[in-house]
Amino acid sequence: MIKKLVLFVSLTGVFLCTASCGHKELPSMGDYSVQVFNETHVRFAPDVYPAAFNAPGPDSIYHLVNGRIILKKVTLPEYKRNVSVKLRVTVASNGDRWDKSGSCFVLPNASGINLLNIAKGEKEFPAVDSVKLEKMIGIIPGTDYQPTVELMRFMTPFGVGHYSSPEDSLTKHRKPVYVDHWEDSVSWEQDITDLYPLLEGGAYVGIFIDTWTLEGYVASMTIDVDESDLTCDALPKKHVEPLMNTVYYIGQEYPDIFARKDVSLDFDIPQGARDVRLKYIVTGHGGHSGGDEFVEKQNIVSVDGVPVLDFVPWRTDCASFRRFNPATGVW
């Protein structure tokens, strides 16, 4: 099977438009760092979080879909100068032994329908063409709806942190002698400067981990903004247009449609747009038997029928550690 995303230039697009500030001196807001989450539980806990929407406590964190999503609003300074933005996510197992797919995301402010008001029961994903998309609601734009934008995708290493002790009963006999120790957590850093427009004016950001255990994980997230030191380095005018997101955050189908057909949508690039870029994130994991997790799959993205991305999301340096995982060893 080949996974294909076919984009036809006719409706919305992902474009970044830049503009110069001339010699005008711009005020400095300074560098900024905000810790959004600090070892916050992400877990399947219906007894603790009994509904799709659970009101936040003093920490202002929403727990959606029985705790498998954490969500919080962040507000950054209103910058006039150019900035670079980095996202850092740290995850440790709180008892879940498995490798789980995770998604760090932002809800587009321009979308009247989003995960938060869907969880509240106030909105629903727009209906889709069942011939083209089967039952895959929420993966492409619709009336008053833009898909959730993924800032980072990750995989949780088997039981990282919770089962890392040298004396842990599940791992002490499985660690190879040539590995000094297992890590207490795993961290990822991603440059999200291109997606900064989605954070301007305040936005809801969150983490989803596909865990089905009560223990789950603890997750931390930090956003760092580095402001330009140049007084005339103006913040470029940029626009981000969400096109597709197949993560099944809430009430959505498992994204196996690519096993049966290509998925296509139309988008427009406005006249005069410059520095147009298409961003595509994929992990070769999280699928059923026969999917990317188990078999090498070609991923193709085409625009107006011309392939612009063609690759296989596959690594060959992980298998040697598989037998040491605290869940099952080799299976």
Segments the model singles out, each with a brief description of its role:
Residues 21-331:
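Extracellular/secretory-pathway and virion-surface proteins
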